[in-house]
Amino acid sequence: MSTFIGQLVGFAAIVFLVVRYVVPPVRRLMAARQEAVRQQLQDAAAAADRLTESTTAHSKAVEAAKAESKRVVDEAQADAKRITEQLAAQAGLEAERIKSQGSRQVDLLRTQLTRQLRLELGHEAVRQAGELVRNYVADPAQQSATVDRFLDDLDAMAPAAADVQYPLMTKMRSSSRVALVNLTERFTTVAKDLDNKALSALSSELVSVAQMLDREIVVTRYLTVPAEDAGPRVRLIERLLSGKVGDVTLEVLRAAVSERWSANSDLIDALEHLSRQALLEVAERENKVDEVEEQLFRFSRILDVQPRLAILLGDYAVPVEGRVGLLRKVLDSASITVNPIVAALLTQTVELLRGRPAEEAVQFLAEVAVARRGEVVAQVSAAADLSDAQRSRLTEVLSRIYGHPVSVQLQIDTELLGGLLIAVADEVIDGTLASRLAAAEAQLPD
C-alpha cells in the first residue's frame, strides 16, 4: 500500500512536472506550427492567384504580340511593295541616265579621237614640211634666196618710217632731254680743244664723280633741286671738287649742275654719257670707231650666251673691284686683242651698273657707240652669213624704213633655217622660216 501510494505520488509529481514545464512549450510549438501552416496555406492561395493572373496576362500578351506581329508584317509588306516600286522607277531613270551619258561619252570620245587624229596629222605635216624646208635650205644658194625674198618683202615696208630716238633720250623726260642736249653741246665745245690724253682723263674723272653722286644721295638731290638760281648748286660742286679734278672736268660739272633735271638719276646718267662720249671721241680720232663698235657688240653677244658671266659681273654682293677684276681677266683671255677704249668703256659700265643687269647695260653701251654717228642699231640674226650685196641691201632698206643710218650687227643662228630676224630698239621683224613653221604648228587644234 505504501508502495502504491509512493508510486502514485511519484506519478503525480511527474504529471505536475510535465504539465508545469513540458506542456507550455509544446503548446507554444504547436501554436507556432499551426500558424506556420496557416501562413503557408495563405501563401499557397496567393501564389495560386498570382499564377492565375500571370496566365491571364500571358494570354493577353500573346494575343497582343500576335496582333503587333500581324501589324508589322502588314506594314513591312506595304513598305516592301512601295520600295519595289521606287527601285523600279529609279532603275528606269538610272538606265536612261546611263544610256544618255554613254551616248555623250561616245560622242566625246569620237570628238577627242578626231581632234587627236587631226593634231597628229598636223604635227606630222609640220614635221614633214620642216624636213622639206631643211632639205631645201641645205643648198646655200636656196638659203640665200630666202634672204633675198625677205629683203624684197622688207623693201615694200620702206615707206612706213619709224621714229627712233637717241638711246639715252628715250629714258628721260622733257626737262632732262633739254638739259642733256645743252650739256652735250657744251661738252663738244670743250672737247674739241683737248688732246686724246686729256679726253681720257676727263672721262675717268667724270666716272669718279658719277660714282660719288651715286653713293651720296643727299648731295645728288641738292644738286638737282629745280631752282631758278643755279648759283648755290655751282658753289657746292666747286667746294666739293675744286682741286680734286681737272679744270675742264670742273667746267663740265658746273654746266651739268646748272641745268634742270627731271630726276636725280638723270644727272648721273648724263655724266656717264659724257664720259663715254669722251672715250668715243678718242676712238673716232684714232679711226677705231668701227673696231670699238664691233668689239662692244661682240661682248654683248657673249653675255647673252653666257648668262653666268653676266650674273657675276652684276653681283652687288661682290665689291666693284672684284667685278672689275673679273672683267679684266675675261678681256685678257680673249682670242683677239681688245681695244683699250673698249676695255675702259666696259670697266666704267661695270662700275656704274646701278641696279641694271650687266647684259642690258653693255647692250645699251654698244647702242650709244653706234648712235654717236647718228646710226640706229639693227640686231640681225640669220641662218648663214650674208653676202656683201645682201648686207648692203639690208642696210639700205632699213635706213629707208627708219629714216636714220643703220648699223647692222649680224649674228648666225642655224636654227632659223632661212630668212632674217631683225630687232631695232623694241621693234622686231621676224621673217625666218623657223618662225613660220612654229606659227603653223601653233595654229594646230589643241
Swiss-Prot record:
Q: Which GO molecular function terms does the record list?
A: proton-transporting ATP synthase activity, rotational mechanism
Enumerate the subcellular locations listed in this protein's record, separating them with semicolons: Cell membrane
- What membrane topology does the UniProt entry give? Single-pass membrane protein
A single GO cellular-component term on record: plasma membrane
Which Gene3D superfamilies does the entry link to?
Answer: N-terminal domain of the delta subunit of the F1F0-ATP synthase (1.10.520.20)
Q: Give a yes or no for keyword Ion transport in this entry.
A: yes
User: HAMAP family, per this entry?
Assistant: ATP_synth_b_bprime, ATP_synth_delta_bact
How it assembles, according to the record, is:
F-type ATPases have 2 components, F(1) - the catalytic core - and F(0) - the membrane proton channel. F(1) has five subunits: alpha(3), beta(3), gamma(1), delta(1), epsilon(1). F(0) has three main subunits: a(1), b(2) and c(10-14). The alpha and beta chains form an alternating ring which encloses part of the gamma chain. F(1) is attached to F(0) by a central stalk formed by the gamma and epsilon chains, while a peripheral stalk is formed by the delta and b chains.
Q: What family is this protein classified in?
A: In the N-terminal section; belongs to the ATPase B chain family. In the C-terminal section; belongs to the ATPase delta chain family.
Q: Identify this protein by name.
A: ATP synthase subunit b-delta
The record lists the organism as Mycolicibacterium paratuberculosis (strain ATCC BAA-968 / K-10)
Q: What is the lineage of its organism?
A: Bacteria, Bacillati, Actinomycetota, Actinomycetes, Mycobacteriales
Gene name, Swiss-Prot/TrEMBL: atpFH
